[in-house]
Amino acid sequence: MSKYWSNITKDIEPYVCGEQPKNKKIIKLNTNENPYPPSPKVLQAIENAAKDDLRLYPDPNCDALRKTIANYYNLSKEEVFIGNGSDEVLSLSFLTFFNPEETIVFSDISYSFYPVYANLYKLDYKLAKLKEDFSIDINDFKNARGGAVITNPNAPTGVYLSLDSIKQILEDNINNVVMVDEAYIDFGGESSVSLIKDYPNLLVIQTLSKSRSLAGMRIGFALGQKELIEGLNRIKNSFNSYTIDRISSLAAIEAIKDEEYFKECTLKVIKTRNWTINELGKIGFKIIPSKANFIFITHDTYQAEDIFIKLKDENVLVRYFNKDRISNYLRVSIGSKEEMEIFMDKIKKIINKL
């Protein structure tokens, strides 16, 4: 610990990312990346963008990308905010809408960046305990004085919350912002975007990292009524006016436009997810129902940590969380069909030896 650090720096416990191995032979099922490459139209846009214009600053307002996203969701450009990945959008949203003197609410088992943001901005928070099946009790979010954050589908469980439940939470918190983090919504869930016109307190946050295969370009966005987006822009422009570079913006536009490729890839992930769930069930695993591009699994006979270590020895990476209530679960990203066949082969051999 350095004597030059501020008290905030000394006190904060940073978020820990999933492992990013240098060994290309490893089957990477630990960070929920898309197993398929970006759209060919995206790759062509990137190639075309590598020209003299890179000497110029990008559009600080990301107008072209905002228009593309607005058209896709039948919104106005003023209802779209762009950030450097949904993590940045979430961070700026915590700062924009939550007050230190009020308590915000999010689930006890959810995206572990939320408490980091809360601690960084000195926000008080309450953890709403998920039910035994990892579903949300919406009563825990009733009258959350400072606001609420819902991950839908949830991470790391993959559990999906219905739009009716989202509506109830919004109505119970009409004077506070409710953020719905939809990083994984495209793998079987129904987005809350359709509710924006009726709920001025709703902010929907999405990313192009998962379903659009652009994790390496860091593009996220928020959707909400104009008043919310105006607030986000005030905070963004107090940090960094240029959140998205020229190449990322052009790539994102093509990723949004290529609906056929998007649907093709998400459908393949969903089919492979269903196949993997079925195969794991045959060897005694219990799988939490998932609407994400990952599954959350456990076994009554074998310890999750032991399986995690053995899989890593076999060059297969999954995610293990040594935390209360989920220490005997593994989160497994859905790879290509070929990758998941290898995963199944390895895990069968491992449990036969344990």
Curated annotation (Swiss-Prot):
PROSITE patterns: AA_TRANSFER_CLASS_2. Keywords: Amino-acid biosynthesis, Aminotransferase, Histidine biosynthesis, Pyridoxal phosphate, Transferase. InterPro entries: Aminotrans_II_pyridoxalP_BS, Aminotransferase_I/II_large, HisP_aminotrans, HistidinolP_aminotransfase, PyrdxlP-dep_Trfase, PyrdxlP-dep_Trfase_major, PyrdxlP-dep_Trfase_small. GO terms for biological process: L-histidine biosynthetic process. Its cofactor is pyridoxal 5'-phosphate. It is an enzyme of class 2 (transferase). Its EC number is 2.6.1.9. CDD domains: AAT_like. The keyword Plastid does not apply. The modification N6-(pyridoxal phosphate)lysine is found at K210. SUPFAM superfamilies: PLP-dependent transferases. Pathway: Amino-acid biosynthesis; L-histidine biosynthesis; L-histidine from 5-phospho-alpha-D-ribose 1-diphosphate: step 7/9. Homodimer. NCBIfam families: hisC. Belongs to the class-II pyridoxal-phosphate-dependent aminotransferase family. Histidinol-phosphate aminotransferase subfamily. This is Histidinol-phosphate aminotransferase.
